[in-house]
Amino acid sequence: ILDHNKNPRNFGALECATCSREGYNPLCGDHLHIHLRLVEGRIEGISFEGSGCAISKASASLMTATLKGKEVADAERLFEDFHSMVMADVAEPVDDAKLGKMAIFAGVREFPMRVKCATLAWHAMKSAISGDQAPVSTE
């Protein structure tokens, strides 16, 4: 998490983006823009811009690295898996095979106020690929 916060992957504007969405977490002050280039149902490019806490930046960085090259349907499934993981009971085991490196965020569920930080980029990504026009807010 610290590495992705200090050296975020896919940070910056995305040339030729086909959709973008803004996300804001007023409780923590996280403010992100997710940019995607979708080609024939595949995420050909994905990046993010903005500022926020270490958890939101690291989550956005890992999300973009994980989703680049994936089918949109796979991205939607990963969103559901990630969201279920961070919302699950602390004692519930984590399926590392499904989530890969994103499983490092399992500990966030012990801190309910931080769940919104971890999921902000994911909600913005899901909103962008579904075509919603409104900015995403965690409130």
Task: Cite the ranges covered by each PLM segment.
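Structured beta-strand/loop patches that form or line metal/cofactor-binding pockets in enzymes
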Residues: 7, 11-46, 50
